[in-house]
Amino acid sequence: MVELLKLVRSSGUAAKVGPGDLQEILKGFNIYTDESTLVSIGDDAGVYEHNGIIWVYTVDIITPVVNDPYLWGAISTANALSDVYAMGGIPVNALAISCFNNCELDIEIFREVIRGALDKLREAKTVLLGGHTIDDKEPKFGLSVAGICPEGKYITQSGAQVGQLLILTKPIGTGILIKGLKEGILKEEDINEAIENMLALNDKARNLMLSLDATACTDVTGFGLLGHAWNICKNSNIGARIFFEKVPYYQLSENLVKKKIYPKGAIENLNFVKNYLKSNLDNWKLILLSDPVTSGGLLFTINKEKLEKIDETAKELEVNYWIIGETIAENVLEVL
């Protein structure tokens, strides 16, 4: 099997441009919008209303996160669909974007990536309408996705209020595990649990979030848990108190980060939030909380009275959840 991870400098969402750099790139632009534009740049996806239908649009493309091309295609697809779910939408159709070195890699590898993507799209009942390919030395695959909000409402990062609970639906640490895989320290069978979680769609988490009348939501991916939590805080003009011992993560990721094995994106993410961070935690814990996750879970806020129904609802929907903290008045990230 070709080691896809050896063909790229960074893997998965760890290859994203850091949040600080992205902020600098977009600074000062006057981006055109019209009266139908409900959400533009700055959230997980764009939202646009047309003929009474609320549409959600996003694009996500990643480098390999595993060496198996089928799994990479499926994980990349789940990752791309996630932003639609985070906005409260349901994906409808998609366009594929693929960068592939067809001079050096067997075409069957490319076909396996597509097969993985098609199977995941079928699971999500999302139609592939076409796509675009580029001959490129570093392989990349992803999707541009369009979805709708059938309930007639959408969720953004800006609705959280003081005194609410922070809910997370998948463990963190995948970026660190992928780094271990890329460095040859781990094998794919060592991270089977993480692979299964990356493959899992966020459709059930979306249904849980809506059932609990979530006030704000994002998906935890390349900017890390702290980076995405800060986006909710910044956009909602509140703060958050996160309890490290309540945050789910893979034990192997702790082992690796203590050995200084983690993607550089974790440090970029931590630097992005350091001016808003209040914490006396060990540095390895903060790095883990800043890990650039691929195909992570949803992070959302709910009123405390919703606790009465969260267990029953999550059980009915067959989705995991963890209460990792609460929102506070001070516009900071307090990590205990």
UniProtKB/Swiss-Prot annotation:
Q: Where does ATP bind?
A: 16, 41-43, 60, 83, 131-133
Which cofactor names does the annotation list?
Mg(2+)
The answer, when asked if Lyase is one of the entry's keywords, is no
* One MF term in the entry's GO annotations: ATP binding
Residue ranges spanning the membrane: these are: none
The cofactor remark states: Binds 1 Mg(2+) ion per monomer.
Catalytic residues per the record?
13
Task: Output the GO biological process annotations, alphabetical, semicolon-separated.
Answer: selenocysteine biosynthetic process
Q: What is its EC number?
A: 2.7.9.3
Gene3D superfamilies (UniProt xref):
PurM-like C-terminal domain, PurM-like, N-terminal domain
The reply on keyword Nucleus is no
Signal peptide per UniProt: none
Q: Which residues bind Mg(2+)?
A: 44, 83, 219
The site annotation (Important for catalytic activity) covers: 16
What enzyme category does the UniProt record give? transferase
Write down the superkingdom of origin.
Answer: Bacteria
* GO CC terms of this entry: cytoplasm
What InterPro entries does the entry give? PurM-like_C_dom, PurM-like_C_sf, PurM-like_N, PurM-like_N_sf, SelD_I, SPS/SelD
Q: Which reaction does it catalyse?
A: hydrogenselenide + ATP + H2O = selenophosphate + AMP + phosphate + 2 H(+)
- Keyword tags: ATP-binding, Kinase, Magnesium, Metal-binding, Nucleotide-binding, Selenium, Selenocysteine, Transferase
Q: Which family does it belong to?
A: Belongs to the selenophosphate synthase 1 family. Class I subfamily.
Q: How does it assemble?
A: Homodimer.
According to its UniProt entry, the function of this protein is described as: Synthesizes selenophosphate from selenide and ATP.
Q: Which HAMAP family match?
A: SelD (MF_00625)
Per its record, how is this protein called by name? Selenide, water dikinase
Source organism of this protein record: Aquifex aeolicus (strain VF5)
